[in-house]
């Protein structure tokens, strides 16, 4: 994967350039270590961050150190390690600090925090307030034998993993129709009241990193009584 490179927004009297390359969706632009911590970035693949730099002509770069600090942890409690890259894997949320060392002094920078969530939502459920409605794989055979009186309310739930919930979307698809022909609507629940029309319900669960799990119900129809 081709990485994205970003020169930092900080300056250093001993460093000519301090570069960060990462396979993130957006470049990681460096800030001062005193800048507020941010965690509004979400990635759905493991992220490898690479550090490089060039010292000013009157000195030399002796080493590059880094540390990945989990969200909520004081960076002073984590020790620096020497190296030029580090991979953040699934289930982690945190920020990088990078230190460039020369005989004339060191320069320390911080990168924006981000979350790595490579897993699609799990424990997904389509709950109905009437019995006989099942949560199924989208590849399951469609059946339409379930009869429901008056109306049925569906609520959607899932475990969204490290990144958390972005949204749930749904669509009702009539018997004999392709699901791809119908548009998604965003909601956490929906009530179906249309009479004597055989349909199935599709629901997709989306986390903040963009991972998606899609399920459907067995087919059903609503009668007056």
What is each residue range found by the language model?
Residues 1-225:
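Low-complexity, disordered linker/stalk regions enriched in Pro/Thr/Ser/Gly
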């Amino acid at each position: 994967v081709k990485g994205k490179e970003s020169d930092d927004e900080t300056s250093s009297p001993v460093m000519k350039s301090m570069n960060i390359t990462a396979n993130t969706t957006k470049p990681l632009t460096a800030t001062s270590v005193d800048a507020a911590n941010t965690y509004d970035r979400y990635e759905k693949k493991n992220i490898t961050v690479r550090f490089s730099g060039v010292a000013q002509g009157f000195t030399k770069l002796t080493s590059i150190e880094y540390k990945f600090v989990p969200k909520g942890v004081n960076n002073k409690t984590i020790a620096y390690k020497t190296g030029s890259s580090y991979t953040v894997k699934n289930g982690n949320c945190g920020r990088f600090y990078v230190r460039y060392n020369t005989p004339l002094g060191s320069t320390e920078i911080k990168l924006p925090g981000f979350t790595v969530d490579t897993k699609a939502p799990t424990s997904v459920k389509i709950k109905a307030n009437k019995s006989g409605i099942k949560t199924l794989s989208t590849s399951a055979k469609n059946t339409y034998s379930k009869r429901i009186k008056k109306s049925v309310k569906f609520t959607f739930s899932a475990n969204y993993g490290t990144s958390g919930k972005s949204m749930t979307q749904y669509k009702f698809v009539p018997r004999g129709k392709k699901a791809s022909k119908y548009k998604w609507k965003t909601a956490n629940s929906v009530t179906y009241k249309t009479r004597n029309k055989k349909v199935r319900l599709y629901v997709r669960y989306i986390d903040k990193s963009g991972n998606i799990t899609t399920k459907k119900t067995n087919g059903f129809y609503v009668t007056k009584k």
